[in-house]
């Protein structure tokens, strides 16, 4: 492809001598067609307003940038959505706990808390399971029901089960080397009274159904030859 030839720009008003043009200002006015532009715009030359200056930033950007790219933290747009309760779990349903300290125990479901966890109890007097929160992923709902209409559950929420943060005390040199047994944490008397009140109302309803007390006291386990997917709970 041949290279384009550059054409020299021709001055429309060549200099006769340095600083003196061939044509006067009035001649160039007509030669350049400025009169036509002025007539087209109502006898006034078109005016272009100057662009507004961009406001200078309050803080100057840094002169130097870090050698390694610093990752910018992404905004957290996650929102807490209430967990949907399984259709097989309704207030009063007897559940089987599958994991944790009380695995295999049968408990009575009382209500779902705002966090999505299930509020359950043994009752404590029958199988030793106190009022506690359980994730519904670790329970099996059975077809057995208990009437819990006489149980008052207004005071039980997620804050009720929250632990009070205790300040750790610095041990002295003597206490550090002494092998002392840790003191057992005592349960507040108020929580003990709440457990007794719930147990009393539940046991009254449980004793009205024959064999239900024995059923709740027995631990669930699989024996040889039993197929979990074929069991009807």
Swiss-Prot record:
Domain of life of the source: Eukaryota
Name of a matching Pfam family: Ribosomal_L6e_N
InterPro entries on file: 60S_ribosomal_eL6 (IPR000915), Rib_uL2_dom2 (IPR014722), Ribosomal_eL6_KOW (IPR041997), Ribosomal_uL6_N (IPR005568), Translation_prot_SH3-like_sf (IPR008991)
Region ranges (Disordered): 48-82
Cellular component annotations (GO), alphabetically ordered: cytosolic large ribosomal subunit; cytosolic ribosome; mitochondrion; nucleolus
GO terms under biological process: translation
Protein name: Large ribosomal subunit protein eL6y
